[in-house]
From Swiss-Prot:
Family, per entry: Belongs to the peptidase S14 family.
Identification of the protein by name: ATP-dependent Clp protease proteolytic subunit 1
Alphabetically ordered keywords of this record: Cytoplasm, Hydrolase, Protease, Serine protease
Subunit field text: Fourteen ClpP subunits assemble into 2 heptameric rings which stack back to back to give a disk-like structure with a central cavity, resembling the structure of eukaryotic proteasomes.
Positions in coiled-coil regions: none
EC id: 3.4.21.92
UniProt record, GO biological process: protein quality control for misfolded or incompletely synthesized proteins
CDD domains listed in its UniProt record: S14_ClpP_2 (cd07017)
Keyword Cytoplasm attached: yes
GO cellular component: cytoplasm; endopeptidase Clp complex
Location of the active site: 106, 131
Amino acid sequence: MDYATRAAGGLVPVVIEQSARGERAFDIYSRLLKERVIFLVGQVEDYMANLVIAQLLFLESENPDKDIHLYINSPGGLVTAGLAIYDTMQFIKPDVSTLCVGQAASMGALLLAGGAAGKRYCLPHSRIMIHQPLGGFQGQASDIDIHAREILAVRDRLNKILAHHTGQPIEKIQIDTDRDNFMGGNDAVEYGLIDKVLVSRASGAA
């Protein structure tokens, strides 16, 4: 069972396609993958990241010149898993268009902002949230110090990524991510996290 199936509670519709060779059944996510649509749903974690990365690489091999559409509805999750997806988005040749449906928080927001310039969207009632990475560690004082320094280094890295994709000064990013910072679509456009709020597909959708 893949992560999208698990996120849907194990209930995933099956669609039937008719062709000259007869009928063929697809789960809905596999059918949408044929249209170069990838769903990033739920917590960002290693298993989900591996599947998203595999789909990105597969679609690149299918057609390196055609856009990939990444639909995001995520509260965030592991920084390392999120950065693995982010790095792959930047690495592959096709543009990755991002679209927030529902929410894109924490690493979800960074992945939304990391889409191809001019191709980052959200739907009208989506919520987007940026903040600094969370961390907690117990152990010897020296180990706690090591982990504290790592969290600060990760925070700086994430802030630089957001500054790069939003065009905001790094100093403003540092202030704005100090606490949970929620935005609606229009605020996210003004901030530079996305390029447009889509009301309908006719308005220029992914």
